Amino acid sequence: MEVKVFRVKGVFERLGKKQPFTKEYRALKQEHVKELVYSEIGSKHRVPRTKIWIESIEEIKPEEAEDPIVRKLSLEL
């Protein structure tokens, strides 16, 4: 299986305020990315999954990645 690069956009609510986010991940499937988003944002910001809304998950080319770590890992292969 091939590892793909995904860009996730969404919003989470913390202390009554909505905070937009954009994250990039390397994963095999969209379902894995969704779980990573819930896990990372929930852990880092202490937000329950019900307060995290994922608006879009799109597969992108490794060259389009804005996160330097994701780009470097993807292009080294």
Curated annotation (Swiss-Prot):
Keywords: Ribonucleoprotein, Ribosomal protein, RNA-binding, rRNA-binding. Belongs to the eukaryotic ribosomal protein eL20 family. It comes from Thermococcus onnurineus (strain NA1). The keyword Ribosomal protein applies. It comes from the Archaea. This is Large ribosomal subunit protein eL20. NCBIfam families: PRK00773.1-1 (NF001981). One of its GO terms (cellular component) is ribonucleoprotein complex. Part of the 50S ribosomal subunit. Binds 23S rRNA. InterPro entries: Ribosomal_eL20, Ribosomal_eL20_dom.
